[in-house]
Design a protein with these regions (language model features):
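Active-site micro-motifs of SAM-dependent methyltransferase domains
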Residues: 225, 360, 446
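Extracellular/secretory pathway-exposed regions associated with glycan biology
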Residues: 229-350, 354-430
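C-terminal cell-surface anchoring/sorting signal
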Residues: 2-22, 437-454
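Conserved beta-strand core positions
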Residues: 163-166, 176, 349, 359, ...
């Protein structure tokens, strides 16, 4: 306890006389305040301008995670397209090795506010004097007021030189990006479609000690706000198909269960092997079935976004709507392959879905994304290089427990619809003709495009 009190006193002296009165401008920041109650018992936080684009931020707080919103926040009110960036650093680590420095976008300073952040943490030990930025960076997301803050994409291996969070509206889509710079330019850590955010938001630096008995002091540099930044790292899919695809609306859906001696414990690798060879490690799959549906809204057990589901083919008899569990049993260890041709306009699109356990989506021969968790809906942002018809492929797997699959499209007006729902304004999808599948397959499309370019 004596050591903690000494460290606390030292930190308070470092910021003594600093203009940290809540609401007063401090350098580039117009506001500096504690969020939640991080000052009990550690003491209140503050922000001090020490050099050009460099600040000391003193903070306590139990964490920025789940429903724990306890941190010090130096921020501005922003509108339109804007990026906030900083170089993370620590003067005194203190507290817990999960003490964090973040760039954070919020709706307000209430605990439980909708928030999107790019987070770093200090060194991987509990030495209070440790002042090292750990080689970890992660996106943090709270998309619903008073829900838990959860983790999106995380990277390790290198220490970031800069982090940033930005809001950009492009082609009608409002997007939030978490960005990381390892010294050679910005990289896209995570991109989120956020249709419901207001124009005016809070954007700035957040620091927490992850331990209310300690204060930590972060030293952040290269602090800057940038108006009208461009999107970073958005994938561009391959070329449109060079041949006709089909004129029957819908998707071809194929489901197969793992054999008696195998399972889907290998994740996507096992799922790919099962849907392409109908076996895993030579063990033949069972209960194969296929069907053509206008949309992909499948349920075995445990519904998510949309009702009026249909059962998975093969593993259960046809049901619409499904009475859970479909077929009267809870099926495990199966994979589903969805193929189609999709009509897209040139430019930005947002397509994704939900799956328990997981699904990945490929368009134009390029993987546009994978779901992060069984209990999240993940939408993937990409660009189509031209207006045309593109190959579409999705692979889903289920290991155990509840299971469903929804493929979704976001519209610029903020609506989320089932992919293929043309009546609602969505992109048209078509079942590939057998001749097209035989000629190209969905691994051969990229090969044909290469030959066509030569």
């Amino acid at each position: 306890m004596c050591k903690r009190l000494f460290l606390l006193a030292s930190l308070i002296l470092v910021l003594a006389g600093a203009p940290s009165v809540f609401g007063e401008p401090i350098g580039v920041f117009n506001f500096s305040q504690d969020v939640g109650t991080p000052g009990n018992p550690s003491g209140t936080g503050g922000t001090r301008y020490v050099a050009t684009n460099e600040y000391l931020i003193l903070a306590g707080g139990s964490d920025i995670w789940g429903t724990a919103d306890q941190f010090h926040y130096a921020y501005n009110k922003v509108s339109g397209n804007v990026r906030f960036e900083l170089s993370p650093g620590w003067d005194i680590g203190g507290g817990n090795y999960w003490a964090k420095v973040e760039t954070m976008l919020r709706v307000n300073t209430d605990t439980g506010s909708i928030a999107y952040a790019t987070a770093t943490r200090r060194g991987d030990n509990t030495d209070p004097g440790n002042a090292v930025v750990h080689n970890w960076v992660g996106a943090q997301i709270r998309s619903v007021t008073n829900a838990g803050m959860w983790g999106g994409v995380e990277w390790g291996g290198s220490t970031p030189s800069k982090i940033a969070t930005q809001r950009v509206v492009d082609n009608g889509y409002q997007l939030v990006q978490s960005l990381v710079d390892y010294g050679s330019g910005w990289q896209n850590l995570d991109t989120r479609w956020v249709p419901s955010l207001p124009d005016q938001l809070l954007l700035g630096a957040a620091v927490t000690s992850h331990d209310n008995w300690w204060l930590v002091q972060a030293r952040v540099g290269n602090v800057a706000y940038t108006q009208n930044p461009g999107l970073v790292g958005i994938k561009t899919i391959g070329d449109p198909l060079p041949v006709a695809c089909g004129d029957i609306p819908g998707f071809r859906i194929e489901t197969i269960k793992a054999g008696e001696w195998s399972d889907l414990g290998g994740g996507y690798a096992a799922a790919e092997e099962l849907v392409t060879t109908h076996a895993i490690g030579g063990d033949p799959g069972r209960e194969y079935g296929s069907r053509i549906d206008p949309v992909v809204n499948l349920l075995d057990n445990g519904n998510f976004n949309f009702g009026d589901d249909t059962s998975f083919p093969g593993i259960d008899p046809y049901e619409k709507p499904v009475v859970e569990p479909a077929g009267g049993d809870d099926d495990d260890n199966y994979a589903t392959l969805v193929t189609a041709c999709i009509q897209l306009t040139k430019g930005l699109h947002v397509i994704g879905g939900h799956s328990d356990d997981a699904v990945k989506v490929e368009i134009g021969g390029v993987e546009i994304g994978r779901t992060v968790s069984w209990n999240t809906t993940d939408m993937f942002v990409f660009t189509a290089p031209a207006t045309g018809i593109y190959s579409f492929r999705a692979v889903m797997y289920e290991q155990g427990g509840g299971s469903d699959l929804e493929l979704l499209e976001a519209l610029p007006d903020g609506r989320l619809i089932l992919l293929g729902d043309v009546a609602a304004g969505g992109s048209a999808v078509y079942v590939p003709e057998p001749a097209t599948i035989a000629l190209l397959g969905f691994g051969g499309l990229a090969m044909l495009r290469v030959r066509r370019k030569r």
